[in-house]
Amino acid sequence: LSNAAGEEVVSIEGRQKLSTYLSDSLRVRFEQLNQEEQEVVLLLAYVARLARERDLNFGRFSRPEWLPRFGVRDHLNDPGGKCASYTLILGKLLRTSGYTVRKVGLASSKNNERSQHHVLEVWLPEAKHWAVLDTIFAHAFVDVSGRLRSAAEVRAAWGEGIKELPANYDMESFSYSCMYYTNWQRVPGFGIIEALFPGADAWLQAHEVALPFVIQMSGYGWIGTLAFGAAALCIVVPW
C-alpha cells in the first residue's frame, strides 16, 4: 500500500489525479501548501480514493460490525465504520512514511455524544505543528496564510471563523467544538480514576494527552488495553 501510494505521490500524473479526490475548497488551495503539507494531503487523497472505490462494501459485512478489524486488509475489504477504518488506513500509511499521527474524535454538539466521527492529526516535522486530516470528506483546513490547521486551531475558529467546509458536512453532528483526543470513558478502569479525581477527562483533553494511535485504532491495541485494564483491576480491587 505504501509503495503504491508513494509512486503516485511523486509522479506528476499521479499527483494531478489524486488531487481530484480532495474536497473542493482544499483542491483550490492545494498549490498554496508547502511541499511537506502537499505530501500528506496527497496521501489523504490516496486513501479517499480507496474509500470511494470500496463504498459498495460498506454495510455488507462478512463479520459482525462490533468485532475488531486487525489489519489494513480487514479495514479495506470489511470496514467496521467508514471514518474509523479509513482513518486507521491513513494513519498507518503516514506512519510508514515516517510521520507521527494521533486520532481525534468529534462529538455531537447537540448531546455531546462521542464517537460520531474520526479524523486524525499528523505531525509536520518541518513546520513543527499538527495538521488535521479527514479521510471521509477528503478534507483539511487551510488558514489565511496557506498553512494547514491543527484540530485545536479549527476548534478555536469553529463556527464563524471556519468557512471552507466540504459539501454535506454536518456541523452539529461532527463538531470540532466537541473534539477529544482519546475517549477515556471507553478505557477500562477509567471510571475509578474519574471518581477519585473528578475532572480527569477534561484535564487530559485540555493537555492533549492521548493514547498511542495503534492502541486506539486497531483490534490488537484494544484487546491489549482491555487485558491490561482487567489485570490492573485484579491487582487494585483487593486492596
Predicted regions and their residues:
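Alpha-helical transmembrane segments
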Residues: 229-239
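Hydrophobic/aromatic-rich core segments of domains that either
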Residues: 88-161
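Secondary-structure boundary elements
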Residues: 2-81
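Short capping loops/turns at secondary-structure boundaries
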Residues: 76-83, 109-113
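Juxtamembrane/start-of-transmembrane alpha-helix segments at the extracytoplasmic/lumenal side
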Residues: 208-231
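Extracytoplasmic/lumenal ectodomains and periplasmic regions of secretory and membrane proteins
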Residues: 138-210
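A structural signal for well-ordered alpha-helical segments within the folded catalytic domains
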Residues: 41, 81-88, 92
